[in-house]
Structure formats: structure tokens, C-alpha cells
Amino acid sequence: DYGHQVVSVMLSCNGITLNYAVILYDKSRSKIQIVQEIAEELPAAPVISYFLCDSWYTTAKVMDRFIRKGFYTVGALKTNRILYPCGIRQKASAFALHLRKTDPDVSLVTVGSREFYVYRYEGELNGIPNAAVILSYPKDGFGNPKALRVFLSTNAELSTQEILDTYTKRWPIELFFRQSKSKLALDSYQIRSRQGIQRYWLIMSLVHYLCCMHSGNYCTFEEGYASLKQQLKQEQFANLYRLIKSSASFEEAFKFVG
């Protein structure tokens, strides 16, 4: 088998979410270094902005690089991340074992259509002087270590609800990969050269952009893809009609269709 690892970044502003970069991870530099370099490329945020990520990228180095550009971080944390509740060093997973539904600091919140029990910790993490950390369990999975999820915000002024709602906005990057695999052959192309791979990803990103912006107004990728597909089909039939109308031979028409 032969595969490639990808680091992808999406930018979102005023309801418009587009692919910003698709970068080949070839182990010549770490994923952390790649994301740090992307942060350096970004212009300073003109308003309060957020870097949304999974637990791979919630490291002090990455978050520091983004905060310098005016981006707070809202991301997932690994459950073995060290916290300091009451000044006592503990893994988040170990601390969560002591939580009870009846604790005054444990509350039930709704995110989307689901309910979660949450506990909020504010304070120090290794390499981070102050952040808000949310320990959460699904309503029906409270106390189950495998169900524990941990989230972080370097903007401690956000409420627990705001942190969780903000984190859900990173879903478009998951959709981008799913759509690129199902519609743009991300998981089935057969290219080995680095240059060829990068060229393909560039074309793929361009097609994704065209699908989202083809009408001059932003729409979902699925809507744009369906519309462009229909437009291409109409153009093909129109060209075939003109060819037949010009008294083209059967062989010429067959060659055009085939």
C-alpha cells in the first residue's frame, strides 16, 4: 500500500468557509512545525478570532504562535493532559474520576441536539499560564472514562457554552476531507511524485473553491458540485445537439460522446 499524510487548514469568516492550505506531511518537519509556519503566514486578525483544532495541535508552541497573530485557540485536549486543580498536579482523566453529577460545579449543557455533563477548570497547564478547560461526558455516559472528552480555550472569558459551540464550528474541515474523498478522488488518485501530488491537491482545492463560489455567492460544496455537474451535462448535450444539427456523421457524434 502507498499513502500520503495531509495537513489541511480551512479559513472561515462571515459564514464563508474555504480551504486555505493542503500540505504534504513527509516527516522532514513535524505537523506541529507545519502549523506553526502556517500561523506565521496569516495576517494579524483584525477582530477576535479563533484557531480551532483537534488534540494533536493544542500544544503550547502552536497556541503561542497563533496568539501572537491575534488568534485564541479552542481545541480538544488529550485526556492525559496535566491540570493543576487547587495546585495539585493531575491528569485530566484522573481528576475526572472524582467528579459527581451532584457537584455544584458540574452542570448539564446542550450542544446541538445532545446533552453533556460538564465541569469547568480555569488555571495553569504546562506551558500555558491560564486557560479554560472543559471536562465533558455525554448525558448517558457520565463517569465512563472512555466517554470523557476534554476541551480547551485560551480565551478564558468565553462561557462553557460558548467554548463548546465554538468547537463544533471545526466540523467543516471534516466535511472537506469527506467531500474530497467521495467527490474529488482524494482517496483514490494514483500519483507518487511529490510535484504531481502537490499539483493534484492544488487542482482539487481549486475545484472545491469553484463549487463553493461558482454562482458568485457562497454555497455549500454539495450544492455547488451538483449545480456544476448539471451545468456541464447541459453543455455536453448542447454541443452534441449542435454537432448533430450540423450534419455530422455517426462516427463524429460517437467520438464526441465517447
Where would I find each of the regions flagged by the language model?
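Short beta-strand scaffold segments in enzyme catalytic cores
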Residues: 7-11
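Single, function-defining residue in the core of a domain
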Residues: 12-258
